Structure formats: C-alpha cells, structure tokens
Amino acid sequence: MEDSSQGSFVATINEDYEAICWGCGLNLVLPSYAPVFKCGWCGAITNQNPVRPETKSFGLRRFRDRCFVVILAVFMLFVICGGIWAAYPVLFSISLACGIFHSVTTATLAISTLSTFILVAFKCAGKPTNILYGTHPGVGNGALNNYTFCNYCSKPKSPRTHHCRTCGMCVLDMDHHCPFIGNCVGAGNHKYFIAFLISAVISTSYAAVMCVYTLIHILPPIEKGAAYASDVAHVAHGNSISILRVVKNICLTYIANAVFISVRSLVLVYLFVASVSVAIGLSVLLWQQLSYIYEGKTYLSHLSSQGTEEDGEKSCRNLLTFFGCPHSIERHLPTIRNLRKRHKT
C-alpha cells in the first residue's frame, strides 16, 4: 500500500521542460512544454512547431507574375500608342497649339507612369537589416524583443517584417504582394507604388476625356429633329429623364450607323471604356492605400488587427511622414487639430 501511494504521489509532480532559445542560445527551463514561448533575456519568440517551407509552387507564382507584368506593360503601351495614333491627327487638325499642348501633356504623363512602374517593379521592396543572433554574449537584453525566426530565410524576423513566398524573401513593412508589378509593396518601394497609382489614375482619366473630345469631332453628326431639340431644352433645366433620353438617342443613332464608323472611332471607343474601367479600379485602390497610411497601418497589419482592440493613430502626420515632408509642416498640425477641438467645444 505504501508503494502504490508513493508512486501515485510522484506521478503528480510536474517535471521542468528544457528548451533552447534561437535568439540568444540560452537553455531555458519551462514549467511545462509550450509550443510557443518568449525568452526572458533577449525577448525572442520561439515556435517549436514551425511550418515546413513549401517550394513546389514558387516557380508557378513567379511565372504568373511575369505574365501579369507583360500584360500590364503591353496595355500601357497600347493606350499610349493607340491614343496617339487615333487622337493626335484630329487634335493637330483643330489647331497647332492644341496638338502641341496635348503632345506635351501625353509625354509627361507617359514618362511619369512608365518610370514609376519600373521603379516599383524592380526596386527592392524592403530587405530587413542583418542582426546578430544565436550567441548569448553577443545578444543583449531585449535585443530581439518580439522577433521570430523565419524558417524560409533562416534569419530573424522583426514584428514589422513578413515573408513573401512568391518573392522568396522577408520584406520590411510589407503591405501586399502585387502580381501586376511582379513584386512586393514594402518599405523600399511603397512611395513609388502610391506615385504609380496617382500617375496612372490621372493618365487614364486624361485618356478617357481625350477620347470623348476626339470622338465628338470625328463621329457623324446626329439628325436633330424637333423631339431632340425638346429633350435638349429639358436637359438644360436639369431634367434627368430628358438626359437619359438624349443619351439613349445618341447611342441608338451611332449603333444604327456602326457600319459607317471608322476604325479610328472604334479604337477610341475601346480606349475610353478601358481607361474609365482602369481609372475606377485604381482610384478605389489608391483611396484604400491612403486610408491605411493615414491610420499608420499596412494592408497586412490591418488584416492582423481585425477582431482585436488594436487601432493605429489616425493622423495627417502619418501621410506627411510617409511622403517625407519636412518637419516644419508637421509642427503646424497640432495647432490645426487643437483649433478644430476648440471650435467643436
């Protein structure tokens, strides 16, 4: 009886569990087994059940990205070259000054869009700095606070760093991986990505306006009867029904005469539809990006903070800091904010 009671007593004692911290190399004594634990010296977080790296679909993802990059580059060149071929003979026929003005505008927007696209596609998205790890004498107290170990790169990974399996590297302040540029958007090229979106939205909006302006000068005139004149008169007074009726009559007239429409007109119509569609999509993306920057977040940090009480500091300073504005401008922001609070009270 004594042996059995003694054996049951020993079985209830919890044995200490030893583990090694990858950050400083110290042997840690844990009260029990824990799949994830944090070192009390260096602050590194160790995951004892790491996810095994997968490299099977790496080549397929890279091939997909290259295809998207080629498609986007061809589309941009088609919009530029197709617009020049279809619109500029008409613009120069209106007046020489008109043609020169739009030529300079097109060249400026094309250079801006293509240069920012090249920068965001080929510039490093943000390689994290190398940091010493693995040896206790070289790693100070709290030097690797909240760092984790990337099993893909076999390097330390800071809380602001995420690994991209498509690019095959860790990216500092990673926002997302964009297949249309074949690159990640991170600390190294985020500003160029925003500049590319702004330039692309302005360029596509300008292309849509120029397509409409050119089509007005080359499409056959509409037969204007008494009903058409009456509808136009009501449009002048803001009648929405008359506006829809006028647009309907114009569309039906051009559809009926589609056989007589030139190839130049068809190209302009396609460019208009494509430009408007792309401009709307990029405008939504640009607004989303600026909203995250205003909140002091990235897209990935926004996803990770969902369902929690973590909320970034919403301030215009985040936008000014992101774009590298001088500190003299930031000094006036608290004054403006305080004035708004005083007016509210």
Swiss-Prot record:
- Membrane topology type, per the record? Multi-pass membrane protein
What family is reported? Answer: Belongs to the DHHC palmitoyltransferase family.
Molecular function terms, GO-annotated: protein-cysteine S-palmitoyltransferase activity
PROSITE patterns named among the record's database cross-references: DHHC
**Protein role:** S-acyltransferase involved in protein lipid modification.
Q: Which residues of this protein are catalytic? A: C178 (s-palmitoyl cysteine intermediate)
What PANTHER family does the record point to?
A: PALMITOYLTRANSFERASE ZDHHC16
Keywords, comma-separated and alphabetical: Acyltransferase, Lipoprotein, Membrane, Palmitate, Transferase, Transmembrane, Transmembrane helix, Vacuole
Principal location listed in the UniProt entry: membrane
Pfam families from the UniProt entry: DHHC
Q: What is the scientific name of the source organism?
A: Arabidopsis thaliana
Under the cellular component aspect of Gene Ontology, which terms does the record hold?
vacuolar membrane
Give the gene that encodes this protein.
PAT11
Top-level EC class as recorded in UniProt: transferase
EC numbers: 2.3.1.225
- Cystines in this chain: none
Catalyses which reaction?
L-cysteinyl-[protein] + hexadecanoyl-CoA = S-hexadecanoyl-L-cysteinyl-[protein] + CoA
Compartments it resides in: Vacuole membrane
The answer to keyword Membrane applying to this record is yes
**Signal sequence region:** none
High-level lineage:
Eukaryota, Viridiplantae, Streptophyta, Embryophyta, Tracheophyta
Q: Outline the extent of the DHHC domain.
A: 148-198
Q: Is Membrane tagged as a keyword?
A: yes
Q: What is known of its domains?
A: The DHHC domain is required for palmitoyltransferase activity.
InterPro entries linked to this entry:
Palmitoyltrfase_DHHC, PFA4/ZDH16/20/ERF2-like
The protein's name: Protein S-acyltransferase 11
Q: Report TM segments.
A: 67-87, 91-111, 192-212, 266-286
